C-alpha cells in the first residue's frame, strides 16, 4: 500500500520486480546510468495530494513525512552521497496557524525518530535554515540529531527547515549592502 505521494516507492517496487531485489546500484549499472552525487527534494504538494483524496491537508503532510524514509533508502541504495529535503520553507509561516502547528508537530516527531534511524543506517544529518521562529524543543532536537550523527560516514542527509530561496537572496543583498555601508563609512572617515 502506498502511504503518500508514490515516487520512490514505485522505483523501489520496479527494481525489486525487474531484478529480483538487487540493489539499485546494480540496476544503474545494467542501464548504464550515472548516479548523481547530490539529490534534493522539495516536499511540496502533500496537502493537495490529500485534498484530492478528500482527506484533510494535514493528513497529506503526515503521509509525506513517511515518504522521506522511502526516499532515504532509495538514494542510499543508489549510492548517492548527499540528500537534501526541503521540509519547511520560510514561506510556510504564511499558512494557517493550525497547519503550521501540525507541520511543527510532525517535525518534532521526525527529528526525534531520525536519531535512531540515522544511527542504524550510518547517516550523517545536518539541518540548515534560520533558527528564529522555531521552538526551543525543536532547536534542541536539531542539536541532538546533528551531535549524535556527526561521526557517521554514510549518506549525508540535510534537512532544510525555515529555509527559503527568496529569504536567502534578501539576506544576502542586505549583507552586501551592510558591507558597502561599512566600507563607505570607513572610507569617508579617513
For the regions a protein language model found, what residue spans apply to each?
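Flexible, compositionally biased loop and terminal segments
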Residues: 4-190
Amino acid at each position: 500500500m502506498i502511504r503518500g505521494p508514490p515516487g520512490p516507492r514505485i522505483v523501489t517496487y520496479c527494481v525489486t520486480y525487474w531484478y529480483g531485489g538487487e540493489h539499485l546500484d546494480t540496476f544503474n549499472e545494467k542501464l548504464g546510468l550515472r548516479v548523481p552525487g547530490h539529490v534534493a527534494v522539495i516536499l511540496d504538494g502533500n496537502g493537495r495530494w490529500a485534498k484530492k483524496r478528500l482527506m484533510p491537508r494535514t493528513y497529506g503532510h503526515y503521509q509525506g513525512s513517511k515518504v522521506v524514509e522511502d526516499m532515504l533508502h532509495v538514494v542510499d541504495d543508489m549510492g548517492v552521497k548527499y540528500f537534501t529535503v526541503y521540509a519547511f520553507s520560510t514561506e510556510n509561516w504564511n499558512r494557517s496557524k493550525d497547519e503550521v502547528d501540525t507541520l511543527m508537530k510532525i517535525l518534532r516527531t521526525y527529528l526525534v525518530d531520525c536519531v535512531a534511524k540515522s544511527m542504524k543506517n550510518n547517516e550523517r544529518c545536518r539541518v540548515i535554515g534560520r533558527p528564529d521562529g522555531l521552538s526551543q524543543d525543536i532547536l534542541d532536537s536539531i542539536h541532538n540529531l546533528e551531535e549524535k550523527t556527526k561521526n557517521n560516514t554514510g549518506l549525508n542527509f540535510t534537512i532544510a527547515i525555515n529555509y527559503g530561496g527568496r529569504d536567502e537572496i534578501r539576506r544576502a543583498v542586505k549583507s552586501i549592502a551592510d558591507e558597502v555601508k561599512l566600507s563607505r563609512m570607513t572610507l569617508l572617515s579617513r
